[in-house]
Amino acid sequence: FVMSLVDLHKETGVSALDLAKGMLDYGLHPPTMYFPLIVHEALMVEPCETESKETMDEVCDIYCKLFELAHSDPEALHTAPHDTPVRRLDEVGAARNTILRYTFA
């Protein structure tokens, strides 16, 4: 399913990218962002058919926590992730200056 975070963005300034980065702090792989292009502030969530109800409930609980955090402390999501080895990457720079091969030293 696809969800639009336009209202959340208007209310709190938290974007789909911010929410996706916040998911990393909870150990979740973020969904596809900003696709389809006709949906503004889109997150496309595609759970596997084999996921248990318990896992889906846990993911829903994390989404609720993130939405609460967006309203109570939006800056925490603007600066997320906090608990990963690498913080926010320069995604524009990475897209424009791609490294397709890496040589280990």
Question: What do these predicted regions represent?
Answer:
Residues 2-105:
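Non-catalytic terminal extensions of PLP-dependent enzymes
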